[in-house]
A protein has these predicted regions:
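Catalytic domains of carbohydrate-active enzymes, especially glycoside hydrolases
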Residues: 7-23, 79, 198-200
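Active-site-adjacent beta->alpha loops and helix N-cap segments on the catalytic face
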Residues: 27-47, 66-70, 88-106, 117-120, ...
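Catalytic alpha/beta core domains of metabolic enzymes, predominantly
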Residues: 107-217, 225-226
Length: 261
């Protein structure tokens, strides 16, 4: 299928992880009327993508814990997932259930994107047993009744959460990044915050692979260009003075305030 070709090329362009997204339960209701992605992937897609990839890891986002979780997670592992992500959990018990089902058979990442997951953050970190964490800004800002996805970044919430992961030695990331020069909050600002906060992972926004590209070769060129520009900018960040990041925080707050006013 055409989408499988895109996944292979994403790997060749330097994307280190390729997703299969099984999450459907509750997502439509949470994000009703929003211009967000509902992937519609299936368990069969895991096997197809696994066969395509040679160097990139295969990350599968499963559904939040429900009565069919054990069967779903077992099949995801059998089909070759390298990492399984648990989304939209609210309790320590849900995390514990997830980790018990996986039982060390592949890597695990927790997607902190509900108000309750943040309220139980210390307990979840103390429980341990998961490999990494990601902060999902879209559902998180909705959960807190905020207006704009990047409010948790501008108001210091993401920084506080990242500090706890860092102290616990848990690799972490947050949100996603658009192409350099794009986004309501420019990608450069977001990437600089990733660097400042010690984040080591982010999700590429749909602007890298949306429906505007009907010509495959044009998409391939634009995709590689977008990745190269991000990598170049990332390589410059360690050389920049602290004042750059102080000014960047100010810009993040200003740009977010413009959106929410």
């Amino acid at each position: 299928a055409a989408s499988d070709v895109y996944k292979r090329q994403a790997e060749e362009c330097g994307v280190r992880r390729v997703w299969v997204d099984l999450e459907m339960i509750g997502k439509e209701a949470r994000q009703l009327g929003m211009n967000t992605v509902k992937s519609g992937h299936t368990l069969q897609d895991i096997s197809v993508v696994k066969e395509i990839l040679t160097t990139s890891e295969l990350l599968v986002r499963v559904n939040p814990i429900y009565k069919g979780s054990e069967a779903e997670i077992n099949e995801v592992i059998e089909r070759g997932a390298d990492i399984i992500m648990l989304p939209f959990f609210h309790t320590l018990e849900e995390v514990d259930t997830f980790l018990r089902i996986v039982n060390g058979r592949c890597k695990t990442t927790l997607l902190f994107e509900s108000k309750e997951s943040i309220e139980h953050l210390d307990e979840i970190i103390a429980l341990g047993g998961f490999d990494e964490a990601h902060i999902g800004l879209n559902d998180l800002h909705l959960s807190y009744g905020m207006t704009f996805m990047f409010e948790p970044l501008s108001n210091g919430m993401v920084e506080q959460i990242c500090a706890k992961f860092k102290e616990a030695g848990i690799p972490y990331g947050f949100g996603g990044v658009a192409k350099i020069g794009e986004g309501l909050l420019p990608a450069e600002c977001v990437i600089a915050e990733h660097y400042r906060l010690g984040s080591t992972r982010a999700i590429l926004s749909r602007s890298f692979c949306d429906n505007q590209y009907v010509d495959y070769n044009k998409w391939r060129y634009e995709f590689q260009l977008g990745i190269n520009q991000i990598r170049l900018y990332e390589s410059l960040l360690p050389m920049l003075p602290e004042t750059y990041f102080v000014e960047n925080i100010k810009k993040v707050k200003e740009d977010v305030n413009k959106v929410i006013k």
